[in-house]
A protein has these predicted regions:
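An alpha-helical appendage that flanks or caps ligand/catalytic pockets
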Residues: 1-106, 136-178
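C-terminal helical cap(s) of enzyme catalytic domains, especially alpha/beta-barrels
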Residues: 121-142
Length: 178
């Protein structure tokens, strides 16, 4: 989640939480992890107790979400983090803060791309384009050259010169719009 400043991005995140259904989030998490959070008190600190999977998520969030270092990771706090974009690592802040986080992941893990999730549509995408893209572009880490300029994702991914349509050996090739 990105905005003009770290404070504005955090405020945006906090604002979105008012729309989250934490009971529903707990149910989803139970399905994802096999852990029923109802078995834990609201005061347990998941940074130190509970399943290892939750402790790993807490460590990832603490490393990437500004202002969370040293916080007590109670059940309500864990559910709030899960409610907006799930269990994924989060990058919340100004363009510089978010770009620093993404660049650290690139450097440390050698990754060459991201699947960015969204909290609202088109809002999250508009914020990325308005705030984050210029910062990444200025750093030279925003990919803008592709094998087929203006081509489809399929053309870019396959890079086989066969155009944007599904390939003949794909089941969908039997169907076309006429």
């Amino acid at each position: 989640m990105v905005d003009e400043t770290d404070e504005k991005a955090e405020a945006k995140f906090q604002d979105l939480l008012q729309y989250a259904d934490l009971e529903g989030t707990a149910a989803l998490f139970g399905g994802w992890s096999g852990t029923d959070l109802a078995n834990f008190s609201d005061d347990d600190d998941f940074a130190f107790t509970g399943p290892g999977a939750i402790q790993s998520m807490v460590k990832a969030w603490t490393a990437t979400v500004p202002g969370t270092e040293g916080l007590k990771w109670t059940k309500p706090r864990v559910l709030e983090q899960l409610a907006i974009s799930g269990a994924h690592a989060k990058a919340i802040g100004s363009p510089k803060t978010v770009a620093d986080i993404l660049q650290r992941w690139i450097t440390e893990a050698g990754i060459d791309g991201f699947n960015l999730s969204y909290a609202t549509t088109p809002g999250t995408f508009e914020d990325m384009i308005k705030y984050l893209w210029p910062e990444l572009r200025a750093r030279g880490v925003l990919q803008e050259d592709y094998p087929v300029p203006g081509g489809s994702m399929r053309e870019t991914f396959l890079a086989d010169g066969q155009g944007p349509r599904v390939r003949a050996d794909h089941p969908a090739a039997a169907y076309s719009w006429k």
